[in-house]
Amino acid sequence: MPKKVCLISFLVACSLWSMPRAAQAQALIPHVLQLNTAQLEKQGLSLAQEAAQLVQFQQFELALPRARLATQLAPNNDKVWLLLGSLHLQNKDYKAAIAALNQSQTLNPQNPDVLFALGSANFQQKNYQAALLNYQAGLKLKPNDPEGLFDLGNAYLVLDKFPEAIAQFNQAIAQNKKFWPAINNIGLIKYEQGDIPGAIQKWQEAVAIDNKAAEPLLALAVALYVKGDKQKGLEMRDSALRIDQRYADLDFLKQNLWGTRLLSDTEKFLQVKR
């Protein structure tokens, strides 16, 4: 399971509420230009806050033009560029996202959220090595961030560096005991390694934390069926798909980092009729 991109926008939106008022222009600038510059920046920050509010209500299409205009009116505010970049990332416009995020990083190189967002942009484009470097850089600035640790684990996972991935997932869990996506992804690795009992244990832990999480429930169903507990597996499968029908789509499962062995077993399992 990869992290959902919209979380980045939401976190940025929350941070924008605390943005300071626009600073006054330098004293040497003519008075009229002072007022105009300050007023434009103030309008830009106001637009950014409107965009942030729209993001909280998932109204991304309305937020984007406001964020874009905000960067023109307040071009020296790194949070405004981060908001614009995260909105482009939400829309899968990766080129525009990276351009905006790079501008944000230029203005504030010490913001780990920018590096995490750049990692997500590279990860979505399958530039996994670049994503890994972004996540590592972000974690140097914010070492105990569970989402950042999880993302780095996913980068290691897709690069088939399983021990490193498990280490990052375990660190994420250490920061947040209820962070079931990291527990789930350890299960994905164990299944690919042929450790079905170990995978079952992890998916059971994930389901115990959130019994409405369709992904670990379906994965657990597959593993139980393969192990021989066919009736229970089929019951769990039906429950998982009632929660989220998308998990019946193998392409969707692949996007959620399910490996070759698990995908093969799931394909057969989904064809079984009760």
Segments from the language model and where they lie:
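Terminal, low-structured helical/coil segments at or just beyond the last alpha-helical repeat
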Residues: Q26-L40, K232-R274
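Structural signature of tandem alpha-helical TPR/SEL1-like repeats
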Residues: F57-R66, Q90-Q103, Q124-A137, V158-Q171, ...
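Alpha-helical segment of the N-proximal tetratricopeptide repeat
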Residues: L40-K79, L83-D93, S120-Q124, N154
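Helix-start (N-cap) detector for alpha-helical repeat units in TPR-like alpha-solenoids
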Residues: G44, D78-K79, P112-D113, P146-E147, ...
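Long, contiguous interaction/recruitment modules in multidomain scaffold/adaptor proteins
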Residues: M1-K42, Q56-F57, L62-L69, K273-R274
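TPR/TPR-like (Sel1-like) alpha-helical repeat modules
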Residues: Q204, A208, A214, L218-D249
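Structural marker of alpha-solenoid helical repeat scaffolds
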Residues: L73, L107, L141, Q175-N176, ...
